Amino acid sequence: LAPWSNYRYQSSPRVQMEDDPLFRRIRQHAELRLDFRATQSTKARLEQIKEFMRLEKEMLQRYHQKGDSGLRLTRARSVIVDVLIQNLFDYALEVVSESMERTKPMCILATGGYGRGELSPHSDIDLMFLYPHSSMGKSLEFLKGTMTREILYPLWDTGMKVGHASREVKEAINEAQKDIRNKNSMLDARYVCGDRKVAKKFVSRFLGFCRSDQPAKYLDELHGHQEERRAEKGDTVFLQAPDVKNGVGGLRDYQGILWMTKVKFGEGGLKKLVSRKYLSEQEARSLDDAYSFLLRVRNELHFRSKRPVDVLHLEKQPEVALGLGYEEEDIFRRVEA
């Protein structure tokens, strides 16, 4: 349960996000700008959050404009959300402790794109609150209510689109068994805050479930979903308005490789495919580079549109190309560059 899974072929083993100076800078900003105290009003805390998010977003846009990679920028935004949720969680625990002598073990996991550490400027945030057994009764309901009020409400009030689920470990695995989309999202699960033992218990049981729950059937089902998705998006890379996320050769195709690898071999990452001779080292590096470039295109789309956009529409292409550093005067040459 290192903060970031070693997905990328070019990443050194078990790289910690804190090793990047940009991510350390974000954490320093949080220490200065986020000071949630019980004496503060809800409005004052909300203003702190809004100002913190505004300043960090402006900083990310500057890094993007100077040419930072798509992957580094999406990881940086994930760190921003991490530190915000960690601060909100600490405050929520203070509120809980006023009414409960002993806080029951629970944790918050990032799932989906947030779990991978790949949040573009306007990407949705997916969270899973893992709670102890429901036999806690009223104490559990109080704990859940406090976490919703002190964590989710502030995120929603600042305009973030946050998806969430509150589950026990067994419930989470049952949901993964019912729906492949839930399973894929949980394959990217990452610890954010709370009791690490609860998180480790979930990861251990979930990966054990994935390895025992007919892996071949999962691969077939995922391949079927991929074919359907590609058909909906034109089933070709030669489109005037490509979908960088769901189109053929888009972000979702790469992510599917990681999910399949994790289920088949028990661990994700292109390194496993290289060691198993499914890919050459050069092919793995090329995939990584292409993926990071698509993330950079998506980041530019989000910054320019000020909303989550994945389709590179024809009228947007000249300005997106310019924002990515392609400065040819002829707009057709610029787009094709």
Predicted regions located by residue number:
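A nucleotide- and high-energy phosphate-metabolite-utilizing enzyme signature
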Residues: 2-337
